[in-house]
Amino acid sequence: MAAAWGLKTLVIDLDPQASATVSIGVDISNCKTTIYDVIVDGATIQDSLVSTSVKGLDLVPASLELAKAELRLSQLDEPDTAMRKACEAIRESYDAIFFDCPPSLGVLTSNALVAAESVVIPVQCEYLALEGLSALVQAIDVVRHGRNPDLEIAGIVLTMTDFRSNLAREVAEEVKRFFPGKVFETAIPRNIRVAESPSFGKPVCVYEPHSTGAMAYQLLAEEVAKRLLDKGGLEAVRVPSGAVEGPTP
């Protein structure tokens, strides 16, 4: 969405499952250099950049080798600073840089937290997700009191929601009660277009821009941009509010 607004955008995929890489339509087998080579072997981000089919969007792809990165990084004196050091050379080249993290609190996620300015936390509307949320918030506090005192939680987004379910409503209320003012108004619903867009190698906002899921991501992006603007974390964003109309399933 940031790229659609004319922002030069970079996605860095830190998930060994490479979900972001695949979803954007990049074939990992064609990538000679990945984020593993950057944070473990000292390659530069410039060496691993991949242009995507989305105008203004670049990617640093993940690879299955990332599963070994935790062990390699843990042997370093400062295992959680590799990503921040690698980003120093390219920060001024992009308007927005996003880290896609694995669903665990290991060294890869720590590297992203040390390098980032803000965190957007996705939470599925399931009870087990609440424990993971609490652990992540505690990890963010540790990083904030250590290597990255400027790190902030931009907000929490409820995902895969179906508010016809009592469970989904109860979990949403619980998250809002424990984290007042942090939960975005926009929730991402369960939507077939969101689920199938990765198989076509396109973000849902490109694959089916008028779908309910794409509309939700558009509204969420506007909320995130507004919060970052209010905090001074984004110098200028021209958000075409309401540019997409007429949602379809």
Spans of features found by a protein language model:
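P-loop NTP-binding core
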Residues: M1-P249
